[in-house]
């Protein structure tokens, strides 16, 4: 059976792995998931990631980050989903926790943070909020 929302599955796997303090989490890989992982790494929410290929199936291995025994990612939630897509112009992209968190946005120029999308003046689909 195919998965209806692979990005929500990735976010849930990260959330669940952090609740049990796992060091790494494996997620089925795709271009969008790799781009989201790159944004999370650039913003300091994860230690790193790598793509592993095993028996023709590529897996995204994400190294989770903790500070003082607590997960760095306090909240990660899906915004736009297959049943209800959420698109915003560059002026309407929301700030997460007054700029302390990030909204991950997919634009015609790729996946980026809300701050970068506002700075470049382009809008897109709001994938998730991370704080």
Swiss-Prot record:
GO cellular component: ribonucleoprotein complex; ribosome
Source species, domain of life: Bacteria
SUPFAM superfamilies in the cross-refs: Ribosomal protein S8
GO molecular function term, any single one: rRNA binding
One Pfam family from the record: Ribosomal_S8
InterPro entries hit by this protein: Ribosomal_uS8 (IPR000630), Ribosomal_uS8_CS (IPR047863), Ribosomal_uS8_sf (IPR035987)
Keywords assigned: Ribonucleoprotein, Ribosomal protein, RNA-binding, rRNA-binding
GO biological process: translation
Listed PROSITE patterns: RIBOSOMAL_S8
UniProt similarity note: Belongs to the universal ribosomal protein uS8 family.
Purpose of the protein: One of the primary rRNA binding proteins, it binds directly to 16S rRNA central domain where it helps coordinate assembly of the platform of the 30S subunit.
Self-association state and partner proteins as the record states: Part of the 30S ribosomal subunit. Contacts proteins S5 and S12.
Family matches, as HAMAP family: Ribosomal_uS8_B (MF_01302_B)
Protein name: Small ribosomal subunit protein uS8
Natural source organism: Polaromonas sp. (strain JS666 / ATCC BAA-500)
């Amino acid at each position: 059976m195919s998965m209806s929302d692979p990005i929500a599955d990735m976010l849930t796997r990260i959330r669940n792995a952090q609740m049990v303090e796992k060091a790494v989490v494996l997620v089925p890989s795709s271009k969008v998931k790799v781009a989201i992982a790159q944004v999370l790494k650039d913003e300091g929410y994860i230690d790193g990631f790598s793509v592993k290929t095993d028996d023709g199936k590529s897996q995204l291995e994400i190294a989770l980050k903790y500070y003082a025994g607590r997960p760095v990612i306090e909240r990660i939630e899906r915004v736009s989903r297959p049943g209800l897509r959420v698109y915003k112009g560059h002026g309407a992209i929301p700030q997460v926790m007054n700029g302390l968190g990030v909204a991950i946005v997919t634009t015609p120029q790729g996946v980026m943070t809300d701050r970068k999308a506002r700075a470049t003046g382009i809008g897109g689909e709001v994938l998730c909020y991370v704080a």
